[in-house]
C-alpha cells in the first residue's frame, strides 16, 4: 500500500533540492562584478586560486600535496570540475605536487608552464599527465598576454622560451606574471630570485597593488630595488608554520616594513582572499 504522506514528503524534498541548485546557479552567474584571488594556506609551498568576474578559474601552482583538493572544494561549486587555466611556475615539489592531484580530479582547458627538463620522478609524472590531459599547452616567455574577459595576464619572465633546457635548480626559471583587472594589478613571482628580479625590472615597470613575495620570503628574493619598482600596497608571503627554512627571512620583512608595505602571511593569517572591483581591494582572511 502506498504511504501518501511519505511520498508527498519525498516529492517536496526533491523539488526543494532542485530549487536550491537552480538558485545557486543563478546567484553564481549573477556575481559578475568582482575578481577574487585566494592565496591558499597550503603549508610550505605556493598555491593561488583566481576567479574572474565571469567565473573563469585560474590556478597558479598546487602546493606540496593533496591539500589543494580540499581548498578547491571550498572555492568552486560542487558541480564544477573544470579549471580554465593552470600555471606551473616551475617544477619543484612544493609547487607541482598538488597539481598532479588536480589533474587527476579536474578537467583542465589550458596549461601554462616553461617546458624545462628535470630529472625527478614527480617531473616525469607531470609530463605524462599533461600529455594525457588533452589541454592546450602554452610555453611561457615574456611579451605573452592571456586575456580572460576584463582580466589580462602578462608574462614578464622568463625573457625567452626555456623549453627543452635542463635545470637542476629551477627557481630562476620561475614564471613571473602580472594580472590586471581595470585599475588593480597583482604580481606573482613563483620562486624567482634576485637574479630574475633584476632582469625583469631592467626591462619592465612592475608597479602592482599586490605582490606575491618570491620564494616564500627567502633572502634569495625580494630585493629592495625590486620592491621599490613594484611599489605594492600589500605583500603576501606563502610559507608553512614553523618551517625548517625559517621563511620569511628577517631582512625581507625589514625591507617590506621600511617601505610601509602591508604584510600578509599564510602561516599566520591562513587562507588570504583579496577581492577587487577593479578600483578597490578588500582583504578577507
Question: What are the residue ranges of the model-derived segments?
Answer:
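Non-globular, low-confidence helical/coil segments that flank catalytic cores
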Residues: 2-285
Amino acid at each position: 500500500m502506498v504511504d501518501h504522506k511519505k511520498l508527498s514528503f519525498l516529492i517536496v524534498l526533491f523539488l526543494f533540492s532542485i530549487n536550491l541548485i537552480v538558485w545557486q546557479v543563478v546567484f553564481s552567474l549573477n556575481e559578475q562584478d568582482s575578481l577574487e584571488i585566494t592565496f591558499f594556506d597550503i603549508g610550505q609551498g605556493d598555491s593561488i586560486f583566481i576567479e574572474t568576474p565571469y567565473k573563469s578559474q585560474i590556478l597558479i601552482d598546487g602546493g606540496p600535496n593533496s591539500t589543494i583538493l580540499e581548498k578547491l572544494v571550498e572555492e568552486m561549486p560542487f558541480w564544477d570540475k573544470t579549471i580554465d587555466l593552470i600555471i606551473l611556475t616551475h617544477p619543484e615539489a612544493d609547487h607541482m605536487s598538488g597539481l598532479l592531484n588536480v589533474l587527476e580530479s579536474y578537467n583542465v582547458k589550458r596549461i601554462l608552464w616553461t617546458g624545462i627538463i628535470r630529472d625527478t620522478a614527480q617531473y616525469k609524472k607531470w609530463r605524462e599527465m599533461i600529455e594525457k590531459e588533452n589541454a592546450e599547452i602554452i610555453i611561457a616567455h615574456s611579451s605573452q598576454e592571456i586575456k580572460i574577459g576584463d582580466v589580462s595576464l602578462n608574462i614578464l619572465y622568463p625573457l625567452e622560451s626555456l623549453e627543452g633546457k635542463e635545470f637542476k635548480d629551477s627557481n630562476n626559471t620561475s614564471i613571473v606574471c602580472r594580472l590586471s583587472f581595470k585599475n588593480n594589478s597583482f604580481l606573482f613571482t613563483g620562486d624567482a630570485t634576485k637574479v630574475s628580479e633584476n632582469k625583469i625590472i631592467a626591462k619592465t615597470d612592475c608597479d602592482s597593488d599586490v605582490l606575491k613575495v618570491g620564494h616564500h620570503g627567502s633572502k634569495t628574493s625580494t630585493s629592495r630595488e625590486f620592491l621599490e619598482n613594484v611599489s605594492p600596497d600589500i605583500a603576501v608571503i606563502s610559507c608553512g608554520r614553523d618551517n625548517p627554512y625559517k621563511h620569511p627571512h628577517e631582512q625581507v620583512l625589514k625591507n617590506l616594513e621600511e617601505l610601509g608595505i602591508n604584510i600578509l602571511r599564510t602561516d599566520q593569517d591562513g587562507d588570504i582572499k583579496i577581492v577587487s572591483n577593479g578600483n578597490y581591494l578588500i582583504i578577507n582572511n
